[in-house]
Amino acid sequence: GPEALQARVFVDCTGEACVARTAGFATAKGDGKTRNPPGQLPPSMMYFLRERPEPVPPQLVEGWFTPVTCEEDLPMTSVWPDGPGGKAIKLKVPGYDSTDTESLTALEIRARQRMFEVLDYFQRVQKKPWRLGHCSPIIGLREGARIAGDYMLTVDDVRAGREFDDAVAR
């Protein structure tokens, strides 16, 4: 249930500005126009495939997903050859609001659906002997809500190693 917490200072390390939003502080997300504008990372899903010594027939029921027919239909999908016991695949799923529970639920569902679409492509089209090993239990959120502070850190600040008097960590 609800709790009351008291402290002189709170440091919001939730990654989604949850504490700041709950306390009524100003937050921002995206560029104010789109959920994942260019230059920002959309949520991503990691999953791992096991390589089988024998051919693997497609595992998925048709009709639940839209079949991927060519590599061009795999945007924002990365395959690493050195996953645990096989391959590791990361796919990004843009266009959802991670601060809204209904949108976040839809994102979780779409990410898993997309995971199976990609797996089906590798099994059916590429004839890869891969089976699903395991996947991340939740989507990886990268850039959702952030605290609207007095100053926004820039790439140049990071590259220059700029220091700030009010830094939280050193």
Residue spans for each PLM region:
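Flavin (FAD/FMN)-binding glycine-rich loop and adjacent Rossmann-like elements that form
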Residues: 1-9, 13-170
